[in-house]
């Protein structure tokens, strides 16, 4: 009897193109699709399909994004490309497209431009861990020294924002020529794919991380104790594990004495599953929605943090008027709203609907958070903005 063919599922990695308008992000996306499907198989997406980005809504925010997929021998990639600068800002802040790494496209005819800098800053703020540079339009530059100069400028700019500018891969190519099928430029796309495979480490799967479950509901079951319910965000909780209840009140410790899913008793609850966790020695009134259940010591509660936020435009159902310092909205983290005050950067007097801005937020109650956590800004239950924790202050 023939053995079944063993097919290991390839690691899945999320990437995207970033960079200044008209530097060739969409052309590069099409070139990657074209060259990799030609070399390794798969379904090709052409420039027009990618450029015609469908509209999506993430937390009420309208974002135009193109998603394509491609394979290298080692991995499966999901790649996002956005048509407009505003779409990038919204995408990165809301985390609609979480990137394990980004391809920064810089036209060698221009060098780094204002949005090049802004996208690098955003990548730093929202926690994009790795950047690979694709210097585009190199077929249009005859002067070798000029290319070296642009590469040096890009590397310095990345170092300025704490990326390893001296060490990260820079590929000099031409997306258009590769798309037109010229072998020497197609080779550069394969070089880029090789850099993606080797420079961006395999992302940690949600299940391998430290256990955390945002609490949505609390019940007490006569004779058994208190049960908290929610969807496991990452990790695994097993019967007998020690856990901490973090946020809003003082952190308390407990032990998981049972895991339930669809009224069935289980030994464990895993990332992505909705389950109830029975807690030893915890009263119903000790726990509330908005806290998290977590592996001991894995996450801590904080009240003050620096953030990067996007304010919804009027058309997106946001505010019709600007806000000023002293603005006190609610910040919605995971499952609950907490009121907070804002501090605007030096020289910024007001923030208009449709803007993005860095601000420091101080909450009236501590929330379990780490850098990279997304939140919504709400006024009376209506979303008026989206943000991400860039740095914890206190």
From Swiss-Prot:
Domain annotation tr-type G: ranges: 10-204
Localization, UniProt: Cytoplasm
Family designation: Belongs to the TRAFAC class translation factor GTPase superfamily. Classic translation factor GTPase family. EF-Tu/EF-1A subfamily.
Name listed for the protein in its UniProt record: Elongation factor Tu
Primary location group: cytoplasm
Top-level taxonomy: Bacteria, Pseudomonadati, Pseudomonadota, Gammaproteobacteria, Alteromonadales
GO MF annotation list: GTP binding; GTPase activity; guanosine tetraphosphate binding; translation elongation factor activity
Domain of life of the native organism: Bacteria
EC nos: 3.6.5.3
Region feature (G4): 136-139
């Amino acid at each position: 009897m023939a053995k079944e063919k063993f097919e290991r599922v390839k690691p899945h990695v999320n990437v995207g193109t970033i960079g200044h308008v008209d530097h060739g992000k969409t052309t590069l996306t099409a070139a990657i699709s074209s060259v990799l499907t030609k070399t390794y198989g798969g379904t090709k997406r052409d420039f027009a399909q990618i450029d015609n980005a469908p509209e999506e809504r993430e937390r009420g925010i309208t974002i135009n994004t193109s998603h394509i997929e491609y394979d290298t021998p080692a991995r499966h990639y999901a790649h996002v490309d956005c048509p407009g600068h505003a779409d990038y800002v919204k995408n990165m802040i809301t985390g609609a497209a979480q990137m394990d790494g980004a391809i920064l496209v810089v036209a060698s005819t221009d060098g780094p431009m204002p949005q090049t800098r802004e996208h690098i800053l955003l990548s730093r703020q929202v926690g994009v861990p790795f950047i690979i540079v694709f210097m585009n339009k190199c077929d249009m530059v005859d002067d070798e020294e000029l290319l070296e100069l642009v590469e040096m400028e890009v590397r310095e700019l990345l170092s300025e924002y704490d990326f390893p500018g001296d060490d990260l891969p820079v590929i000099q190519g031409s997306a258009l020529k590769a798309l037109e099928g010229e072998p020497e430029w197609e080779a550069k796309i394969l070089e880029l794919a090789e850099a993606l495979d080797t420079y961006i480490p395999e992302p940690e799967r949600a299940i391998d991380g430290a256990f955390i479950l945002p609490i949505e509901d609390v019940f007490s079951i006569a004779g058994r104790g208190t049960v908290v319910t929610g969807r496991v965000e990452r990790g695994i909780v097993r019967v007998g594990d020690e856990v901490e209840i973090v946020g809003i009140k003082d952190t308390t410790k407990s032990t998981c004495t049972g895991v339930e899913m669809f009224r069935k008793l289980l030994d464990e609850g895993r990332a992505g599953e909705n389950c109830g966790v029975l807690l030893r020695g915890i009263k119903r009134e000790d726990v509330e929605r908005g806290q998290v259940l977590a592996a001991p010591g894995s996450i801590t509660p904080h009240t003050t943090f620096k953030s990067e936020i996007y304010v919804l435009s009027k058309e997106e159902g946001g505010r019709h008027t600007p806000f000023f310092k002293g603005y006190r909205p609610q910040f919605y983290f995971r499952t609950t709203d907490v009121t907070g005050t804002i501090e605007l950067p030096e020289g910024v007097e007001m923030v208009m609907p449709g803007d993005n801005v860095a601000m420091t937020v101080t909450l009236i109650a501590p929330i379990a958070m780490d850098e990279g956590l997304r939140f919504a800004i709400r006024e009376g239950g209506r979303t008026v903005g989206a943000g991400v924790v860039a740095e914890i202050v206190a």
